[in-house]
Amino acid sequence: MHIRLSGTSILALTLAAVLSAACGTKSSETPGATGTAGTVAGGRVSQIDIGRSLNADKTINGTTGSFKPTDTIYASIATENTTAPTTLKARWTYQDGQVVNESTQTIAPAGGARTEFHISKPNGWPTGKYTLEVFLNGASAATKDLEVE
């Protein structure tokens, strides 16, 4: 006995097989969330702390997420597993996405390190919500929210 399949039947069977195989597949990407740190090529941002002053080792002296309009706002970025010269960029944005400051530093390969960024505005920051986004070698690696009250 011979079974004869039409072109439409073969197409339907192929489509069914493809859809069946895809149903159990999960994406390996996890979207980044505000206030998180992440890994990108060339290392990892493991922590962002923000506050009004720094210690000698570039850690924050008293972390906070709430600032006065005339405060200098410091960020201490902890990186891990950097194996080549790595570029860190800090982008500070105001609540509507307006970039208020952006600066870049190159760090030497050290495995783990702390890097400091800061912003100030002597005549005062507008009150509202701000976000610090840190980029590692051009890729978004972490964000931190803060507020000026």
Q: Which positions does each model-derived feature cover?
A:
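Bacterial signal peptide processing site
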Residues: 23-26
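Sec-dependent bacterial lipoprotein signal peptides
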Residues: 1-21
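Short proline/glycine- and polar residue-rich coil/turn motifs
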Residues: 106-113
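Short edge beta-strand/loop segments characteristic of extracellular beta-sandwich folds
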Residues: 73-80
